[in-house]
Amino acid sequence: MVPKLFTSQICVLLLFGLLSVEVSLQVKPQQFSWAQWFSIQHIQTTPLHCTSAMRAINRYQPRCKNQNTFLHTTFANVVNVCGNTNITCPRNASLNNCHHSGVQVPLTYCNLTGPQTISNCVYSSTQANMFYVVACDNRDPRDPPQYPVVPVHLDTTI
């Protein structure tokens, strides 16, 4: 009986650990609105190598981010996608604030390959042209006033 109880307690602790990791991935730095954080993480008009580009994201986190996608387009172009028809978010079916880009854009997918020490994160880069799906919300007072609805989350690429 004791080994089973001990094993189940470990499983519960592991589950809470995994949930806290997942929740921590959703945390943004307080000084940014969700749209500003989206822009930092996902908008890159001129492609850079991932190891360099990811420094701008990792400086706000206590660890190397495992993966990230940069859209090579402008924030204004992504804001325009927010005007497309609402769809259920492919990665979170409980949300209906997603929008399909309708056109492919060049993008870079970054994947952590090297040491996970924050001062020395190393990434591989994969280039592609793909559609994307973003979640959009009403603007925060810190967001540009010309955009009443802004992108806040890159849900998926297709």
Curated annotation (Swiss-Prot):
Signal peptide limits: 1-27
UniProt catalytic activity: an [RNA] containing cytidine + H2O = an [RNA]-3'-cytidine-3'-phosphate + a 5'-hydroxy-ribonucleotide-3'-[RNA]; an [RNA] containing uridine + H2O = an [RNA]-3'-uridine-3'-phosphate + a 5'-hydroxy-ribonucleotide-3'-[RNA]
Subcellular location: Lysosome; Cytoplasmic granule
Keyword Glycoprotein assigned: yes
Glycosylation sites: W34, N86, N92, N111
Disulfide partners: C50-C110, C64-C121, C82-C136, C89-C98
A biological process term (GO) from this entry: defense response to virus
EC number(s) stated in the UniProt entry for this protein: 4.6.1.18
Gene3D superfamilies, per database record: Ribonuclease A-like domain (3.10.130.10)
GO CC term (a single one): extracellular space
SUPFAM superfamilies, per the entry: RNase A-like
Annotated positions of the 3'-nitrotyrosine modification: Y60
First-tier enzyme category under EC: lyase
Residues forming the catalytic site: H42, H153
Highest taxon of source: Eukaryota
Keywords attached to this entry: Disulfide bond, Endonuclease, Glycoprotein, Hydrolase, Lyase, Lysosome, Nitration, Nuclease, Signal
GO molecular function, one term: lyase activity
Residue numbers binding substrate: K65, N66, Q67, N68, T69
Keyword Transmembrane helix found: no
Subunit and partners: Interacts with and forms a tight 1:1 complex with RNH1. Dimerization of two such complexes may occur.
Function: This is a non-secretory ribonuclease. It is a pyrimidine specific nuclease with a slight preference for U. Cytotoxin and helminthotoxin. Possesses a wide variety of biological activities.
Annotated family: Belongs to the pancreatic ribonuclease family.
Protein name listed in UniProt: Non-secretory ribonuclease
UniProt lineage: Eukaryota, Metazoa, Chordata, Craniata, Vertebrata
